Amino acid sequence: MRSTAIHFRTLMLGAATALWLAGTAQAAEVHVMISGGLSAAYNALVPEYERTTGNKVITAYGPSMGTTVNAIPVRLERGEPADVLILVGYALDDLIKQGKAVADSKVDLVNSKIGVAVKSGSPKPDISSSDALKRALLAAKTIAYSDSASGVYISTEMFNKLGITAEMKDKARKIPATPVAEIVARGEAEIGMQQISELKPVHGIDIVGPLPDDLQKVTVFSAGIAKGSKEPEAGKALIKFLASPAARETIVNAGLEPIVGGAK
């Protein structure tokens, strides 16, 4: 019975995908640049898009912002090929203003919350309120946060809201070009904070939970077509699929909240 149900869901996903991707008859090579927040769900969904359309997807990963070698703005500046850009919404807005992405192609895909993680088997601190999180951060010897959107918020706003900016100066560090969860899993930080969707795929950690509501920063991840794309129609079809009901279950399982009607 279980295998029958799984087979049925697979058939339904394929059928739904075919409907959403109707009109992409000729195979294409689609270059995608994507930041970490949506990567796990995207990686799970791309094979279905490729199978249904015959298109081949070539993916480059990197932060939505910053100056590291893999950051999406840096990749674009180097002239790397791109058809689809998937990153933090306001970072995509910046690329649109710079003439590097097509303005009317923007689609908001998901909302993403920040979570807290510890090494597997370690005691889970109380983070049920802002005061509890403050105590946990002050008690921790080492703290890690990302070099992308969540880390910018944590280091420039959240610590200040909690009144612990000075105390965090020597114990909290920004992690460039590496998932924060990997640092926590290796025991190099007692507490890690990053998008829940970026924490979930990493083994060796336990997710304590999301930040308290009064400290939470929900990040919108959006997709758009890169200016100068060689395959804009195939790129639009991929974005349409990622925003479709066929992708919803995979996105939710990755710790994200799909945005309905995200087209701008």
Where are these regions (language model features)?
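Bacterial N-terminal signal peptides
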Residues: 10-22
